[in-house]
Amino acid sequence: MISVNDFKTGLTISVDNGIWKVIDFQHVKPGKGSAFVRSKLRNLRTGAIQEKTFRAGEKVEQAMIENRRMQYLYADGDNHVFMDNETFNQIELPGDYLKDELNYLKANMEVQVQSYESEVIGVELPKTVELEVTETEPGIKGDTATGATKSATVETGYTLNVPLFVNEGDTLVINTSDGSYISRG
């Protein structure tokens, strides 16, 4: 059990029959009445975000999440196959389970697979990935307005906005948390 006064961003807790990750929290001490903790939580099974208020000092159960390094192998229809780097066991996860992660997954990529009580609840990607541009419009010479962008499609099928100087065949470094262009690889 952990006190809500000890909340930190990224902490995982078990509340209301769900596994939740603390995204944001705020200790509130009103002039009248008792203190409380206002929190924003993400359900690790469904991805839903919920705001919840706890009384100061209230105890909640901390969820022990196991992270295992795994390698993404391939897509098998709608399923995606991962291999444990230590035991070489393979697991299959359905495509709808991975959601946004599919935009960045490519063969042989190392990821962290998160599980709670032997149930897989999520896949954590590296902070950045390098992906090759497969389709984009050619940059027009002299079109160098500050901050101008165009759309580009990378090898996974994901489309993002990139600077005008990016061409087909370039390798891009992409931020996996928001899908934005960082630099050329």
Curated annotation (Swiss-Prot):
Major subcellular location class: cytoplasm
Pathway: Protein biosynthesis; polypeptide chain elongation
Superkingdom assignment: Bacteria
Listed name of the protein: Elongation factor P
HAMAP family: EF_P
Record-linked InterPro entries: Elong-fact-P_C, NA-bd_OB-fold, Rib_uL2_dom2, Transl_elong_fac_P/YeiP, Transl_elong_KOW-like, Transl_elong_P/YeiP_cen, Transl_elong_P/YeiP_CS, Transl_elongation_fac_P
Role: Involved in peptide bond synthesis. Stimulates efficient translation and peptide-bond synthesis on native or reconstituted 70S ribosomes in vitro. Probably functions indirectly by altering the affinity of the ribosome for aminoacyl-tRNA, thus increasing their reactivity as acceptors for peptidyl transferase.
GO cellular component: cytoplasm
Keywords: Cytoplasm, Elongation factor, Protein biosynthesis
Compartments where located: Cytoplasm
NCBIfam families: efp, PRK00529.1
